[in-house]
Amino acid sequence: MVPHEFVTTAYDLPGYRVTRNFGIVRGIVVRSRSILGTLGAGLQTMVGGNISIFSNLCEQTRSDAFELMIQHAGQLGANAVIGMQYDATEIMQGVTEVLAYGTAVEVVPASK
C-alpha cells in the first residue's frame, strides 16, 4: 500500500530517489447526481453561495478515485506515486467521471 504522504503532484519526492518506474496508475469513479440531490441543489442555488450537496459529492468522488489509484499502485509493487493529477469529464448530463492518475514508482531514501 502506498502511504498518502508518498503521493505528490511533483515529479520527485524530497529526500528520496526513484529506483524503479512502474508506469501510469489510475483510479476512475463515475458518479451521477440523484433526483433528490439535484432538487436540494436547486433550492440551494436560490439563496446563493456554496452548493454543499455537490461539493460533498465532488470531494467524496475525488477521494474514492485517489484511493483506487493508490490501490492500483500498490498492486504493481510501488511505494509512491509522483506527478499525480485529477481530471473530470461529464460523460452525459448528470454523469461525471473523475480520474486520479500519476506515475507509480519505487523510492528509497536519497542517502542509500
From Swiss-Prot:
Q: Name one Pfam family in it.
A: YbjQ_1
Question: Which cysteine-cysteine pairs are annotated as disulfide bonds in the entry?
Answer: none
Sorted alphabetically, which PANTHER family does this protein's record hold? Answer: UPF0145 PROTEIN SCO3412 (PTHR34068:SF2), UPF0145 PROTEIN YBJQ (PTHR34068)
Family the UniProt entry places it in: Belongs to the UPF0145 family.
**Per its record, how is this protein called by name?**
UPF0145 protein Acid_4599
UniProt organism field = Solibacter usitatus (strain Ellin6076)
